[in-house]
C-alpha cells in the first residue's frame, strides 16, 4: 500500500510508525511544512490511563516518551487568595518538540520517509496514493476544500486566549482565577519539563477589549500578563513562541473520510486546552486507524467506516466535556 501523510504532527507520525511496523512493505511518506526540530507551543499532557493504551501499540516510543515525563497527581485551583486541591489524578507532561522528535526518530528507523519544508496546497500530485492521511491541522485545506463532504463544522469560541510558557515549575495542574480593572482572567498552567511550564491565559472578549492589547506585540502581552501574575510568578518569567491572542476553534466533522482520504488529529477534531487532550486524541486516532486497516487487510471500504465507528463516540464525549 502507498500511503501519503500531509502534515507531520503527532497523528501522522504515530500512525506512520505503527503502520510501517506492522506492514513493512508499505510505502509511507510524510510531508511537513515546518523545518525539522521546529514547532509551535510548549508542552503536551497525558494521563496515566492514556499511556497504558500506547504501551501495547509500540513499546519503544512508549518508553522514550515516559522517560521524558514530569509527573503530578494534583489539580490546584486559586481564587481570591484561596487554594483548593484535588488529588489522585495521575498526569504527566513533556515538551511538544521532544515528543515529535521521538516519534519521528522511530518512524525513520522503521523506514518511513519524511520531508520537511514542504508546503502543499493541493493533493492532486498525490492522487496515486492508496491512502491519503490529512493531518495538517486546524486550518487544513483538505478539509476546507471538502467541507460539505466531511460535514465540517468549525466554530470559534468567544473567549480570547494566548499560549505562553514560563520558567516557573508547577507541581500540579494549576488554575488561576484573577481579576483586575479590566475583568476576570483564567490561567491554565502545567510543567512539561524541569524548570519549564505551559502557561495559557484566557479571558472574555469583553475583558480583552478593555486592555488595549488588540493587535499588540508579544512583548506587550508579556508585560501586561507579567504584571497581572506578578505574585504567582515571583522571580520567574513568561516566555513567548508565536504567542498571539486568538479564539479557540472547535472543529467537528460528521464524516471522517472521503474515498481514500481520512482526517486525523486537529484536522478532524479539536479539544479545548482546559482539558489538555488534543495530542492524546491525535495519537489515539493513529492507533484506531492502523488497527482498522490491519483488521480489514488494508481494504479502505471496510477500514475507514470502522475507524469512524471506533473514534466518534470518544471524540464527541471529550468535546462535550
What are these regions (language model features)?
Residues 5-18, 133, 244-321:
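Conserved mid-domain beta->alpha element of the FAD-binding
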Residues 17-21, 105, 144-147, 291, ...:
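Short, well-ordered alpha-helices that flank and scaffold nucleotide-derived cofactor binding pockets
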Residues 48-163:
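Conserved N-terminal helical subregion
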Residues 128-248, 252-253:
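Conserved FAD-binding catalytic core of PHBH/FMO-like flavoproteins
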